C-alpha cells in the first residue's frame, strides 16, 4: 500500500505538471509581442519553467520539514491501519462524533505515550543492570581491601613479636646503640671520618 507521504509527493508532481501545461511556449510568447519567436524566447520560457518547478519543490520541502508532516502522515497511516485491523477482527467502530476533543487527542497520543513508556522501562532495566554490575565491583573491592588490612595486621603482629623477642634477649638495646654509633657517619660521613682519623693519630703519638 502506498504511504500518505508517497501519495502527497505524487500529488505535487501531478499538480506541477498540470500547472506547467497551462503555460505553453505559444502563450508565453504572446506576453512578449515585441520579441520575435525563436530560440531566445524558447530559452527564456524553459528557464522560467525550471525556476518555477524548483521553487515549488523547495517550498514544499520546507513546509514538510517545518510542520513535521512526514511524522504526522506516518501517524495517520498507523491510525488507519489499527482501525482496519480492529474492523477486520470484528471490533465495533468508535463513533468519534460523540467524543470530546480531549478524548480524541488522548486516544491519538496513546500509542506515542505507550512507546515512551516502553522506552523508559527499557532504560530502567539498563540502569538496574548497570547498578548490579557496580555493586559486584564494589563488593570485590571491599573484599580486596579487607584482605589487605588482614595481611597488614598479621605483619604488625609478627613485627611486635620480633621486637618483644629482641627486648627479651637485650638485642634491641644493642641494635639501638649500634645505630647511634653509625648515625654520625650516615649524616656527615666526611667530617666524622676526619675526626676519627685525627683521634687515631693522637693515640699513636
UniProtKB/Swiss-Prot annotation:
Could you list the residue ranges forming a coiled coil in this record?
Answer: none
Using the UniProt record, give the first listed, main subcellular location. nucleus
Tell me which Gene Ontology terms the entry assigns under biological process. attachment of mitotic spindle microtubules to kinetochore; cell division; chromosome segregation; spindle attachment to meiosis I kinetochore
Keyword set for this entry?
Cell cycle, Cell division, Centromere, Chromosome, Kinetochore, Meiosis, Mitosis, Nucleus
Q: Where in the cell is it found?
A: Nucleus; Chromosome, Centromere, Kinetochore
Concerning Pfam families, the annotation shows: Nnf1 (PF03980)
| Entry's Gene Ontology cellular component terms | condensed chromosome, centromeric region; kinetochore; MIS12/MIND type complex; nucleus; outer kinetochore
InterPro entries in alphabetical order? Nnf1 (IPR016851), PMF1/Nnf1 (IPR007128)
Q: How does it assemble?
A: Component of the Mis12c/MINDc subcomplex in the outer kinetochore. The KMN (Knl1c-Mis12c-Ndc80c) protein network forms the outer layer of kinetochores. The KMN network is composed of three subcomplexes: Knl1c (spc7 and sos7), Mis12c/MINDc (mis12, nnf1, mis13, and mis14), and Ndc80c (ndc80, nuf2, spc24, and spc25). The mis12-nnf1 protein dimer directly binds to the centromere histone cnp3.
Purpose:
Part of the Mis12c/MINDc subcomplex in the outer kinetochore which has a role in kinetochore function during late meiotic prophase and throughout the mitotic cell cycle.
Protein name per Swiss-Prot or TrEMBL: Kinetochore protein nnf1
Instruction: Name the source organism.
Output: Schizosaccharomyces pombe (strain 972 / ATCC 24843) (Fission yeast)
| Gene that specifies this protein | nnf1
Amino acid at each position: 500500500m502506498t504511504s500518505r507521504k508517497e501519495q502527497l509527493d505524487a500529488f505535487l508532481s501531478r499538480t506541477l505538471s498540470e500547472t506547467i501545461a497551462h503555460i505553453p511556449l505559444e502563450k508565453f510568447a504572446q506576453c512578449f509581442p515585441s520579441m520575435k519567436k525563436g530560440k531566445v524566447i524558447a530559452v527564456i520560457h524553459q528557464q522560467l519553467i525550471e525556476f518555477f518547478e524548483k521553487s515549488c519543490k523547495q517550498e514544499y520541502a520546507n513546509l514538510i520539514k517545518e510542520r513535521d508532516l512526514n511524522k504526522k502522515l506516518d501517524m495517520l497511516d498507523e491510525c488507519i491501519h489499527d482501525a482496519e485491523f480492529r474492523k477486520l477482527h470484528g471490533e465495533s467502530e468508535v463513533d468519534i462524533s460523540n467524543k470530546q476533543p480531549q478524548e480524541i487527542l488522548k486516544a491519538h497520543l496513546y500509542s506515542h505515550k505507550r512507546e515512551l513508556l516502553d522506552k523508559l522501562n527499557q532504560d530502567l532495566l539498563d540502569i538496574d543492570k548497570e547498578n548490579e554490575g557496580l555493586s559486584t565491583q564494589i563488593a570485590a573491592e571491599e573484599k580486596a581491601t579487607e584482605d589487605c588490612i588482614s595481611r597488614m595486621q598479621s605483619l604488625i603482629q609478627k613485627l611486635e613479636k620480633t621486637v618483644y623477642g629482641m627486648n627479651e634477649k637485650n638485642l634491641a638495646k644493642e641494635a639501638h646503640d649500634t645505630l647511634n654509633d653509625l648515625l654520625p657517619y650516615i649524616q656527615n660521613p666526611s667530617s666524622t671520618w676526619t675526626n676519627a682519623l685525627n683521634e687515631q693519630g693522637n693515640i699513636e703519638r
